[in-house]
């Protein structure tokens, strides 16, 4: 390969005439040179670089890019495969763990099924827990219950703690001996009646024990421990009919309702009513002194009214019973029969069935007889049915009568040179509570006296006779007489406002008694709006032509508008 310069020299060597001719032509042509633009200079600078790249091999670049793409794709695919494998291994391990748990449960069920004395062992563990609880209570300071609680036998345990069959009705032991005695198993009676009708998950034992009435009773009585409730029952004499039909009082202690069938009434205590409203509890509240206290032979709840009468809440329209609260019958009548009652006691009074007199409290019945009231139609007055609490004045007097402890003040005593002055100061400080009590008593007496005076003044003002203006019919010759017009009936709030005006107008020149009725009932001229009393009197007596509205505040009058423009 020859360069272009060598080709040119060779061409000139072979054709010398051509070069001379070309040179002759060049002499005849004028060349005009101009400076190059910056773009041409940059292009000239880049030419060797472009030439180098052009001379390089393009096949090597394509191979490198393809190799890089292959490596990237390979790494991404490997990462996805590793993640998928890890997830599959984790899922497999989880399944194996669940299989092991199920196998362990099956093995446990097989061992329990083979064990014939399983129930006895469970009862022993419960008894052991009871003894541990008793020992803990004795160590905690309950020494008075230790002698009684150490003798707790299996019968007492059965009253307080349910056995395995109490957890679920359908949860029976797997042994053949227990299947033979299915008819003899005791079905537990739940204290709370729920609305749930679902039968799912019957084979799984519940984590919560059913509410035993014995435990609930000792909670209601306020005892600190279960042993105290068992060893110290609260006897209550209640009428009970024997087999002969003769009513005899029986003692009722705290015992489960499901173990004593028949008519039962628990001892009434206001603290057991509305346990979820303990903060709002008040002994004078009507709803706090009423509630469910037992059940009848037909397992119907017995409702105690606030006056002590025992009833069964029964709807008067559909004869539905079993309501455990007064609000229940209110909701039932409102939703089912579109009947609204203004209060719960009124709803109970109209939807009730009284128990027989032998099951009622004779003292309460005697109160009804004294007042000639019918329990089916009336309630006892609240002041008779509910005893009033003691006045808090006695408590304050007891507090004031408590012995006072005089504190020593040695530092203050050192500052006093005269000991007699220091003793007088101490005596004065000790006597300040007595002086304060006397001052408060005098203040109460003054306030009562002022209230009595205000009541007397209001009564005297109300009893003031109404003197109407003489009618024109009196001067007429006719014998017919017309009755004086009745004064307008005013509300109590308007009467109080009028009394205040009378007291404020005592300092005026003319007394209020000398003014006519229209002036007395007229509103104060400083008020922006007329009073109701003035409107009533104006309607009765007619408009007054002499009374004209003042034009002082009439800003739209023509004279004022003209004066403002000028």
UniProtKB/Swiss-Prot annotation:
Residues annotated with Phosphoserine modification: 282, 505
Polar residues biased stretches: 25-42
Gene Ontology CC terms: ADA complex; cytoplasm; nucleus
Stretches with biased composition (Low complexity): 241-255, 467-496
Bias (Basic and acidic residues): 449-462, 515-528
One GO BP annotation of this record: chromatin remodeling
Keyword Phosphoprotein belongs to the record: yes
Subcellular location field: Cytoplasm; Nucleus
Transcription regulation found in the keyword field: yes
Transmembrane parts of this sequence: none
Record key words, sorted: Cytoplasm, Nucleus, Phosphoprotein, Transcription, Transcription regulation
Residue segments, region Disordered: 1-65, 231-256, 384-411, 449-566
Basic residues bias (residue ranges): 557-566
Subunit annotation: Component of the 0.8 MDa ADA complex, which at least consists of ADA2, ADA3, AHC1 and GCN5.
Further details from the record: Present with 339 molecules/cell in log phase SD medium.
General function of this protein: Functions as a component of the transcription regulatory histone acetylation (HAT) complex ADA. ADA preferentially acetylates nucleosomal histones H3 (at 'Lys-14' and 'Lys-18') and H2B. AHC1 is required for the overall structural integrity of the ADA complex.
Name of this protein: Protein AHC1
Organism: Saccharomyces cerevisiae (strain ATCC 204508 / S288c)
Gene name tied to this protein: AHC1
